[in-house]
Regions:
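N-terminal helical capping/dimerization or prosegment-like subdomains
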Residues: 1-93
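Short strand->helix junction
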Residues: 71, 150-151
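Conserved active-site and cofactor/substrate-binding residues in soluble primary-metabolism enzymes
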Residues: 5, 31, 35, 120, ...
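Active-site metal-coordination/substrate-binding segment of hydrolases
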Residues: 76-146, 152
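Short, intrinsically disordered, charge-balanced linker/junction segments flanking boundaries
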Residues: 156-161
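Short, contiguous clusters of charged residues that form electrostatic/catalytic patches at enzyme active sites
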Residues: 12, 38, 123-127, 155
Length: 161
């Protein structure tokens, strides 16, 4: 995939991800938290990852693994990528010039709740790793550990790890 197409794919995924109101600091968004974990699970599964949603540590933890079968004779490295899908509350009344849960571009920058912390980074990693898998250029095994409690102190993540 060429760079513009890859960037378009990243942008589309980030738009979908930002639209999910995964606010961990307010219990009324518990259903949105569940939907976000399921959305991540589905994206990872459709791209060849083994995925489990782990409960019992606060909000669900998405744990995904991709075992690279290419060049299986060589000893491969294993990379763990950590991130979080939960966000802080946001509203136009707090100074947002647009809907915080709708990704917008302004002056070459993306605006939207989570675009910087941490949904944007997760999508950069996911988009890149998925493309490397498709091109059969991924030379290592990859795991993603994506939690939904970072904005509330990551309680329980130490027990999970």
């Amino acid at each position: 995939m060429d760079q513009p197409a890859l960037f378009d794919r990243y942008t589309q995924l980030l738009k979908e991800f930002v639209a999910l109101r995964s606010i961990s600091t307010d219990p009324k968004y518990a259903e949105d938290i569940e939907k976000t974990a399921a959305w991540l699970r589905n994206l990872l599964k459709e791209n060849g990852f083994e995925v489990e949603i782990v409960k019992g540590f606060g909000n669900p933890i998405v744990h995904a693994q991709y075992k690279n079968t290419e060049n299986s004779v060589q000893k491969k490295q294993h990379v763990l990528i950590y991130g979080h899908y939960d966000v802080q509350p946001a509203s136009k009344e707090e100074g947002w010039s647009s809907d915080p849960f709708e990704l917008t571009e302004k002056n070459g920058r993306f605006l939207g709740r989570g675009a910087v912390d941490n949904k944007g980074q997760i999508m950069i990693y996911l988009t890149t790793v998925i493309e490397l898998i498709k091109q059969k250029k991924l030379g290592y095994d990859v795991s993603f550990l994506i939690e939904g409690n970072e904005e509330t102190g990551s309680a329980g993540i130490d027990r999970f790890v």
